Amino acid sequence: MKEMAGTLVRGICGQVEGSVIPGMLGMEAGQSAFGDVYAWFKQLLMWPLVDSRLAGGSEHDALVDGISDRLMDRLMVEAGERPVGSSRVLALDWLNGRRTPDADQKLRGAIIGLSLGVDAPDIFKSLVEATAFGAKAIAERFMLEGVPVKEVIALGGVPRKAPYITQTLADVLGIPVKVAASEQTCALGAAMFAATAGGIYVDVSKAQQAMGCGFDMEFRPRPENSKRYVELYELYHRLSGFMESMKER
């Protein structure tokens, strides 16, 4: 907390001394939608099958489940093979409003640059990039307020199941993204605090050293992609400003 003395980060959701670990400062920030953005797009593509009035029964349900399971994998493969900026499609990730920085739930998302040559993987790629740009906007706010962001630790389903998305995040942020090895990080963290409170370890740091599982994946930014994403991020900011100006219309 000494490094943060007198610093109050504007536009985040919370900043409390000792809220996470005693003697340290906890700062809360996040996006209103990340994985939900991909789920929304998947639902759009699946709608003709899921909502079909012409089919039903176990065979139809099995077909829907099979396509649903493979759809996202196929989208990620196709999107990952396409160069950054190749489609000129740009998206804004405010499909559920904006949480950080500067919360405003009245804001809405956008997709621009569409043409008859754009396909589903192009749009999906733009949505993945948009969620990464949203994360960069948060990191940028911290850095502008004097809080360095040197690396990101990712946990949960998306980082483990979707390496394309996590690699894009590293490319956009320009810093390494480590993926926690544990699939139950929240439960593991609770167990660490319980072990400390029960006197098994003298502090949370010791519990982390003894009980932590470390990381099993690390994604490092690819210089060429990162350079291109700097340019696209500026366009993302311009689109953000336009959508903010349209909020009340």
Model feature map: region roles:
Residues 2-249:
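Glycine/Thr-rich phosphate-binding loops that ligate phosphate moieties of nucleotide
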